[in-house]
C-alpha cells in the first residue's frame, strides 16, 4: 500500500532506502534541497510518521524496500 504517494515521493523514499541525505537526494533528482524537504514533510504526513527512520520502517513493513 503506497498511501497515494506521488511518483516523486516514491523516488524520495527510494533514495532514503539507499541511505542518501537530503542534499544527495536533491542532486540525484535534479531538484532543490527545499523541494526535497517539502517532499519529505508530505511523505511523513501521508504515512503518519515523524522522521526518516519511521518512513524507512514503514517501507519495510509494506515490502517497498
Pin down the residues of each PLM region.
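A general structural signal for well-ordered secondary-structure junctions
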Residues: 19-22, 65
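Short, basic, alpha-helical segments at the C-terminal edge of helix-turn-helix-like DNA-binding modules
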Residues: 52-63
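Recognition helix of helix-turn-helix DNA-binding domains
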Residues: 21-54
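Regulatory hinge/linker segments at domain boundaries
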Residues: 1-14
Amino acid at each position: 500500500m503506497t498511501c497515494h504517494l506521488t511518483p516523486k515521493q516514491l523516488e524520495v523514499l527510494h533514495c532514503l532506502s539507499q541511505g542518501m541525505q537530503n542534499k544527495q537526494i536533491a542532486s540525484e533528482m535534479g531538484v532543490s534541497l527545499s523541494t526535497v524537504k517539502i517532499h519529505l514533510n508530505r511523505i511523513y504526513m501521508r504515512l503518519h510518521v515523524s522522521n526518516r527512520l519511521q518512513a524507512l520502517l514503514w517501507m519495510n513493513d509494506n515490502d517497498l524496500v
